[in-house]
Amino acid sequence: MKKTVEDRSLEFLIRRRNDAELPPLASLSCKHLKQHHWRDAFDDEQAALREQLWAVKTQLDVIPAETYTATRNKLFPLAASGEQRNFSNRAGHKLLESMESTGVWMELSKLLRGKSTKRPRDFAFADVCGGPGAFSQALFQAGRKRGWRHLHGYGMTLAGVSGLDWYAHLLKSPQFTCTYGLDGTGDIFKLSNIDCLASITKAAPMFLVVADGGFNVDFSVTNYQETISSRIMYGQWLAALKLLRKGGCFVLKLFDTFSPLSRAVLYLSCCMYRRVHVAKPRHSRVVNSERYLVCVDFLGYPSEGWSRYLDSFYEVGFVDNEHVPQLIPREWCLQDAVFMADVRDMNTAVATNQVIALQMILDAAPAMTEELKAKTIEKKPAAGSDDGRTPPPDEGGDGE
């Protein structure tokens, strides 16, 4: 009997050895960073699992987009862009589910109330690369439900890009402040723009940073979405380190976690936050590689040397969008047995479910093709009809 899966929430704790010393990050130099093209920016860690996943993804290439979407939505109803009474898309649901499953709400409540029984103190959040604002929209609504009436949001996103600028109601809200950085572009690839956002929020009680940045990649290179997205992933992660107050939390969207850079970011996160999770929320399709890094209780930089190196790495390491630099020696991660066991377990669980889900689509696609053909024939006007009317389009398409 063939295996089946369904959309459901998964959550994984990522730890490092309790007795492990902090890695000597400040001793590293950015003068001679190793660079790899995004096609070659993987190593042999869990290579068999990654290649198995890629092989199944590649088999989908022959399935027409309409057939794939219809099959996916039939097998996995949560994949359809429904349940949108509160948010304009599913991104808000995924953020709130990730925060709920990893205890972020509880942590923020403790942080804001302390020992006081009075109303919680004010706090702010930053929405990085978040346009048009689904995350901010979700946070404002969740804040109202929890009685956080004085919540203030700050946002930075690319300027002048259709579909990415903030929702009009956010721009008009006195509770939301947007910036496009020092140069007015909102480009997070420029460290000066991140520093500008940090300067604007310096006096704010910044206890939450969320980051949903990414971009669509061509269908022919979807297997490399993780490494193609390396620069924006690192930039958002670095922004959180600059923006958060101690005790704050961070949520970042990721695509796969197989590459050495993703592994290094997870490892260093374990050094700078009390608790680190990877969440796969229920509304994040089981058929895709998306997941969320959730970091709880920011401890701060261990030293100024860490801050200088991580800044310099961003400016010097990413020479273009084609190459991925080496952040830390890979041995630093591999020699920590606790960390590697957690990462391998997480990758195995998410990728295995994804392979099963994609195989379910491959198996069901032929029947869906015939079903769609039959519907097309039914919609054609009878021979000799002269009413000139065009049948209405199918409903239920995925708007994302």
From Swiss-Prot:
Which cellular components does GO assign to this protein? nucleoplasm; nucleus
Q: Which Gene3D superfamilies match?
A: 3.40.50.12760
Q: Which residues bind S-adenosyl-L-methionine?
A: G133, D212
Source domain of life: Eukaryota
Q: Could you tell me the keywords of this UniProt record?
A: Methyltransferase, mRNA capping, mRNA processing, S-adenosyl-L-methionine, Transferase
Q: Where is the RrmJ-type SAM-dependent 2'-O-MTase domain?
A: 86-299
Does this UniProt record's set of keywords contain Methyltransferase?
Answer: yes
Organism listed in the record: Leishmania major
What is the designated name of this protein?
Answer: Cap-specific mRNA (nucleoside-2'-O-)-methyltransferase 1
Enzyme's top EC category: transferase
Gene Ontology biological process terms from the UniProt entry = 7-methylguanosine mRNA capping; methylation; mRNA modification; mRNA processing
Q: What is the stated purpose of this protein?
A: S-adenosyl-L-methionine-dependent methyltransferase that mediates RNA cap1 2'-O-ribose methylation to the 5'-cap structure of RNAs. Methylates the ribose of the first nucleotide of a m(7)GpppG-capped mRNA to produce m(7)GpppNmp (cap1).
The reaction(s) annotated as catalysed by this protein in its Swiss-Prot or TrEMBL entry are: a 5'-end (N(7)-methyl 5'-triphosphoguanosine)-ribonucleoside in mRNA + S-adenosyl-L-methionine = a 5'-end (N(7)-methyl 5'-triphosphoguanosine)-(2'-O-methyl-ribonucleoside) in mRNA + S-adenosyl-L-homocysteine + H(+)
A molecular-function term among this protein's GO annotations: mRNA (nucleoside-2'-O-)-methyltransferase activity
Q: What is its EC number?
A: 2.1.1.57
> Where do the segments described as Disordered lie?
373-400
Query: Where is the catalytic site?
Result: K253
